[in-house]
Amino acid sequence: MSAASLYPVHPEAVARTFTDEATYKTMYQQSVVNPDGFWREQAQRIDWIKPFEKVKQTSFDDHHVDIKWFADGTLNVSHNCLDRHLAERGDQVAIIWEGDDPADHQEITYRQLHEQVCKFANALRGQDVHRGDVVTIYMPMIPEAVVAMLACTRIGAIHSVVFGGFSPEALAGRIIDCKSKVVITADEGVRGGKRTPLKANVDDALTNPETSSVQKIIVCKRTGAEIKWNQHRDVWYDDLMKVAGSTCAPKEMGAEDPLFILYTSGSTGKPKGVLHTTGGYLVYASLTHERVFDYRPGEVYWCTADIGWVTGHTYIVYGPLANGATTILFEGVPNYPDVTRVAKIIDKHKVNILYTAPTAIRAMMAEGKAAVAGADGSSLRLLGSVGEPINPEAWQWYYETVGQSRCPIVDTWWQTETGACLMTPLPGAHAMKPGSAAKPFFGVVPALVDNLGNLIEGAAEGNLVILDSWPGQARTLFGDHDRFVDTYFKTFKGMYFTGDGARRDEDGYYWITGRVDDVLNVSGHRMGTAEVESAMVAHPKVAEAAVVGMQHDIKGQGIYVYVTLNSGVEPSEALRQELKQWVRREIGPIATPDVIQWAPGLPKTRSGKIMRRILRKIAAAEYDTLGDISTLADPGVVQHLIETHRSMQAA
């Protein structure tokens, strides 16, 4: 399929949208010409305790990076997500919890959620947690995790959610960095039929003497498994809730008070504690959730992410609840008990909007029509994609098979550091190009620069930067502002550097070509790994592909491809040659893979991102310098890839 395919805006989408093409153009223009006026107006969508006077006070100067929005205003996030909805929709369902086991589900109304949050906020205070203290949340995808997040915001504590798949070492590092006072966890997590010993992992993490800031562990009962207990330190969630009072006034917080820390892996060294603050983040989360998904009251919204990632923070919890939405919290994985799980959940809860990741889409696509066998799917109105660029083939499959060729797709591009979507087509405003993140959201000013930082105009490819601040932007890295400046503002002076490369086409649409450190340079030709991967996945027998550079005596860099075949397809030398020719035909001779290695599985983080760093090391036979693989979803994959690589070397 050519990258130039254009899917026009659906008439149904235009008929019901908040933002048609003309509205987008007018609002976008206003947002970049007069950001103060634009955001002053948009900020009225949330409740303020003390209204702000100042709107935007921001500097990207690398000697003085300082980002403040609505700084003299005060508010409370939990009030905005709960209390203000009670009069109108107290009995509406706020959270639909869908357990790992399809038989488990629970509905929690706004009134019930409000009561639980007030109780747990009081319980936290009883454990000596106060404004400005950091609470680490290491939990499965259960309602208590959302209650814990909102309870922190109610009393002004800062939460740091750590994904439940991270190892004790990774957890300890994240506790030490922010000097956490309390850890909230569960006896075990359940995911894809497997149990994770969360409480045991916390115990293990806390054997590190540097975690001495932790005073208490609060434990939810998820499976009832036997766990070790330290009576001086450990306390049951249920015991606290039984005695907690159900009224708790929300704490008045400054717009620039910290809301949460979320750790994201640095390409080197220790994880970065990305810090988001209260006012700007909530305004931006709420506005993007409404406009990107054209969210209307009463709709059922399902973002499949984990709350351990920024997507879960912004589009399971804060955006939807600020907007009074019904949001789905899914404990499981898309292919358990079988590959029809996503389709079944859509029908069971009459989901209107589905927001998921390319890795989940490709897993379904590998099973073909079986993924939606027997499903109705008619409740769906809009699809979304997040996490990495989606290859055009996967986009098209998602559009035709899951969305029945009638649901627009919002292919959103953003980062932990950006708080919420920065680029996406809007369903009622922009024709869709499969694989393109399309246009910037309101207030976002993207640009392409060459390696010297010179702006490139028109249709071109380069480093993607953002020229001015937006309210959802991270303010710093916790405890390390210098690293924040060095990472994002030093490379290109006066600009926020995203770390991504991008191409802008003749229509002004943006195409993310992958991390700049994932760029291949083959005989002087720059090529994004995403481009080669897309071509490979376009082959009918290929489920997934990961491309890395390898040293090549003649070309400088060669192209090394790891290929996962569709179920039922056998690898062979003939197929290997066929795939090489296929990519050559799709992109050109310069993109012909030098090596194809069959890979039944790829090393992925728990959020589904492929760890190309590990793949580069294996391709170079540097097996003993792989670094930390504890954060992988399935570390066993690595050993298999090493053995295959060794046998290829020997052959």
Curated annotation (Swiss-Prot):
CoA binds at R191, G192, G193, K194, T311, N335, S523, R584. GO terms for cellular component: cytosol. GO terms for biological process: acetyl-CoA biosynthetic process; acetyl-CoA biosynthetic process from acetate. Mg(2+) binds at V537, H539, V542. Its cofactor is Mg(2+). The modification N6-acetyllysine is found at K609. CDD domains: ACS. It catalyses: acetate + ATP + CoA = acetyl-CoA + AMP + diphosphate. Its EC number is 6.2.1.1. Keywords: Acetylation, ATP-binding, Ligase, Magnesium, Metal-binding, Nucleotide-binding. Transmembrane segments: none annotated. It comes from the Bacteria. Acetylated. Deacetylation by the SIR2-homolog deacetylase activates the enzyme. One of its GO terms (molecular function) is acetate-CoA ligase activity. ATP binds at G387, E388, P389, D411, T412, W413, W414, Q415, T416, D500, R515, R526. Catalyzes the conversion of acetate into acetyl-CoA (AcCoA), an essential intermediate at the junction of anabolic and catabolic pathways. AcsA undergoes a two-step reaction. In the first half reaction, AcsA combines acetate with ATP to form acetyl-adenylate (AcAMP) intermediate. In the second half reaction, it can then transfer the acetyl group from AcAMP to the sulfhydryl group of CoA, forming the product AcCoA. Belongs to the ATP-dependent AMP-binding enzyme family. This is Acetyl-coenzyme A synthetase 1. It comes from Pseudomonas aeruginosa (strain ATCC 15692 / DSM 22644 / CIP 104116 / JCM 14847 / LMG 12228 / 1C / PRS 101 / PAO1). The lineage of its organism: Bacteria, Pseudomonadati, Pseudomonadota, Gammaproteobacteria, Pseudomonadales.
